[in-house]
Amino acid sequence: MGQDSNWQIDDRVDDVFNNVVIPVFESLINDYDQVDGYEVKIVSDGPLILGIEKYSSIRIKHPGGLEMIICVYWVKNSERLIAENILLITHNKSFDIFSVTKEELASQVKFLSGLKT
């Protein structure tokens, strides 16, 4: 990849986090936090993976006490955004950073965290 391509990817990643990831997390907090015993908040936890350049995480605590932490992250120089339940590492989903939508990401975060849909 050339330097221009890396710059374009970096800009796109910033755009995705600002306009897709954070709004999805804020929407989940508004829709679920303190509703029917759920606790939902943004946390600083992240996966232990080399090369992660940017990430955001949300914790969903279910009424019975079960906690799920969903991390959305980007590995430097890739064109993939990953949503992963970092407490159940085998559960993840990747998205193309140039086509990911709020709806796709919200649906996957709900699925990975076990939230009602």
Q: Positions of the model-derived regions?
A:
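Negatively charged, low-complexity tracts enriched in Asp/Glu with abundant Ser/Thr
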Residues: 2-55
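Intrinsically disordered, low-complexity regulatory segments enriched in Ser/Thr/Pro
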Residues: 55-107
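Solvent-exposed, charged interface segments at domain starts and junctions
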Residues: 1-7, 62-67
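Lipid-handling modules and contact-site tethers
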Residues: 4, 8-12, 16, 92, ...
